[in-house]
Amino acid sequence: MSGSQKVEESRKVETDAPAQIIYRIDKNRYLTLENYISCDRGGQVYYNDSQRGIKTHLGWDNDFYDFSYRRGNNIAAYQGSIINGADNGYLAFPGASTRQYCGSGRSETGCPVFFFFSADHGNTFIYKIVAMEYSTPERFSQLKVVVANDGVYLRDESKTEDSYSRPTGLNDLSSVNKLRFSDGNLISVYDDWQKKIDELVKEELIRKKMPYANEYGPRFHIFDYLRTLTPPKTHEERNLMANELSEIQIRIEDEVYKDGIKFPKPSTSSIDVKYQCNKNIKAKTITYTNESNGKKEVVKNEQ
């Protein structure tokens, strides 16, 4: 590092902006944006449950420092819809990369969409990235998230869904995808489907007394198996066996996938379905505290 270069010192940020409710589930449960400069400049988002006496920060420790303020607020930046309709303690609050972070969509780090999920009424939350390919904040404005008692459902409604649409993985949101909670983790229904398909294919291979039935599994490759046979199979025989396995797999996949996933209709629904921040409310003064020496600098918000 040259002598002319300086390492920017971390400064903690405090503002006089009043807390504002940006999302409400019901009269007792809501999100607040606090300690912000403006709706798109920093601050911390908290989940509040006045009935249970819960207030939980949705974010990280570095959210309080000026570097994060320059990158906006990831929760408030989310422009899609969110319906919290579970009554068993499940909650989810999506967030998204801000324009300061994502820019024009050419960011090397991508523009992830994520959500915070709780299974204990908001006492604790886990963090889950659900998509990385979004190019700008506007790109995920059509994302729909619904929380029900059996998990979190989500879909990018800007994409066309047809009768053959099905999730091809956790990050595929072209059709309704679902995550269920188990042992502290969120598991994609796609993983469940693949496990079921593998089990049913193996059962069918055993029933048909295929020679490789007991070896079949998620990592099985028919041509790798065929290369081990002696005497070797002819080209036509290899293709015949591979096609037979493929037909079994496709038939069982169609059977497992046929009903697809639909958004549930929760018995209750949140009052709000989108985050709403009043852009007219801003901080008047901002206090920066230097972490190394405790020196404070108070400035007026000129925005």
Task: Give residue ranges: language-model regions.
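Beta-strand-rich domains and repeat architectures in extracellular enzymes and scaffolds
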Residues: V7-Y46
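Repeated scaffold domains used in trafficking and secretory/extracellular systems
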Residues: D16-I21, F64-I83, M132-V147
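Short beta-strand elements that form the blades of beta-propeller/WD-repeat-like
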Residues: Y23-C39, I83-G103, S141-D162, D198, ...
